[in-house]
């Protein structure tokens, strides 16, 4: 019986290693490396330390990207690699609807801290707004959802992130009923997640070698 159990787990371990070794280096680094895990945790830890020192009032907020900043979509990358496919909006939409993304390392502790301090979070993501309910479902499954969070997802191709950030600064567009906010921190995995004009808040950028505009 013992030999059977050992053999069974050996087969599982071998299969995992074999499939893992077939992944592109960028995806394998995110999925398996201690460096990726450590970096993400360090970024969230540093942000926690910094925000403890910041005065927070009703006008304060942080702007966060979602994918590869809060939500870990490496499983999507694994699946399209196994199929010999590359990114497409069709497969990506199906993945988002599944609401199966995991958390970026360190995110849960950071969100617990944010909730205790009652800091307003505004999510500005290029996920399409038509899939907001699936995104919320995913956040709930990960136990980081809060009904006070604001989601400014993409309405159409012209609805760039800088446009939505400007709505936050000026209290216009979808922020009209809420009012303007003072941003004390930005979180993202690409340069487009950060403001060039209103850079008073600290910026925290996460490693994402899997995709981007380079």
Protein language model annotation of sequence segments:
Residues 71-72, 77-105:
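Metal-dependent phosphoesterase signature
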Residues 2-5, 16-64:
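Non-catalytic pre-domain segments flanking phosphatase-related domains
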Residues 25, 31-34, 38, 128-214:
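C-terminal cap/substrate-recognition subdomain and adjoining C-terminal extension
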Residues 94-122, 129-130:
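Short, acidic loop-to-helix structural element flanking the phosphoryl-transfer center
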């Amino acid at each position: 019986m013992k030999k059977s159990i050992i053999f069974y787990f050996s087969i599982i371990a071998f299969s995992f290693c074999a499939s893992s070794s077939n992944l592109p280096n960028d995806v394998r680094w995110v999925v398996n490396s201690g460096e990726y895990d450590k970096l993400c945790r360090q970024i969230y830890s540093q942000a926690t330390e910094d925000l403890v020192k910041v005065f927070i009032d009703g006008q304060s907020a942080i702007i966060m990207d979602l994918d590869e900043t809060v939500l870990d979509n490496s499983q999507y990358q694994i699946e399209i690699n196994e199929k010999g496919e590359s990114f497409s909006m069709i497969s990506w939409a199906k993945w988002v609807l599944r609401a199966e993304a995991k958390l970026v390392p360190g995110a849960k502790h950071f969100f617990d801290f944010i909730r205790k301090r009652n800091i307003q979070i505004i999510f500005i993501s290029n996920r399409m707004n038509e899939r907001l309910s699936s995104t919320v479902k995913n956040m709930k499954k990960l136990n980081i959802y809060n009904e006070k969070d604001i989601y400014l997802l993409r309405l159409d191709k012209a609805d760039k992130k800088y446009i939505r950030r400007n709505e936050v600064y000026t209290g216009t567009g979808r922020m009209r009923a809420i009012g303007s906010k003072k941003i004390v921190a930005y979180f993202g995995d690409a340069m487009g997640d950060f403001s060039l004009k209103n850079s008073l808040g600290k910026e925290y950028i996460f490693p994402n070698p899997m995709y981007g505009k380079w």
